[in-house]
Amino acid sequence: MKKKPIIIMTDSNSGIRQSEAKDLGIFVVPMPFTINDEEYFEDISISQEEFYEFLRQDATVSTSQPSQIYLEETWTNLLKEYEEVVFIPMSSGLSATCENAKNYAKSFDGKVFVVDNKRISCNMKESVFEAIALAKQGKTGSQIKAYLERTSNLFAVYIMVGTLKYLKRGGRISAAAAAIGSALNLKPILTTNGDKFEKVAMVLSVAQAKKKMIQKVKTDIETAFKNEYEKGTMTISVAHTENLAEAEKFKAEIMKELPNLKFRWVDPLSLSVSCHIGPGALAATLGNNAFMDQE
């Protein structure tokens, strides 16, 4: 049987569910993590609802990464049906999965291409959709990887953290700062360039946080992403952690304030991210997709 040219592969940090992956004709690696010393796989052995119930019970939660054996076996099986694999994991600055996968791929004779384009969540999902479009155009794995890495700076992420409890637990803020922040109901807004999360603002309410994030997006499309915005390729999505109702409201506010910006998705943040920030988070994610007309 003749092999198909290429398959796009990502991990569950993209927010793409297993059911959606089947519809798209791609492969999604379920990210592993440990809860109370037991291993779980996102969207396979645990649901979002079950995960947040564990968090409410103050379970011990830690993130992990796909094993070498798992990735190598997966690639071996995919290459029985496809000539090439393009793997788009979460940014190398936020997870060791990307660098490790690059090393594992060296033994696959140039048939596995690991992309590091600094993405996470809806921006990562946007990269997957671009990769799918490029594959349909007949581009090779090498060409897809080159394009995604060349355009890796065309994104922005702003996340309002709903509770300081999990930042404190992970050692990202001190106990004193968490106590003061919680007493004042402060909500930090974080951003990332793919290497680490940094605080860009501290606000007193969800309403203020949404306003601040929209302001940040407006600044981005007027400056750093002006050319892409004017071309009509910039997109925006909303992500959240167990905060769907507020996320839908945020979507409506964004569409009202930025009617010319293409809205894409309201998605839950991956459990790997939720481990560190807990429930109640809300995010605005700017991305770029030059091939939306081909979907």
Where are the language model's segments positioned?
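Long, low-complexity, intrinsically disordered polar/charged segments
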Residues: 1-8, 76-81
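Mixed-charge interfacial surface used for oligomerization/domain docking
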Residues: 2-4, 13-27, 32, 84, ...
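N-terminal glycine-rich anion-binding loop in soluble enzyme alpha/beta folds
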Residues: 6-65, 70
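Short N-terminal secondary-structure initiator segments
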Residues: 42-71, 126-144, 232-237
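Glycine-rich phosphate- or other oxyanion-binding loops that anchor nucleotides, phosphorylated ligands
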Residues: 58-100, 145-148, 152
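Short beta->alpha junction loops
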Residues: 65, 116-119
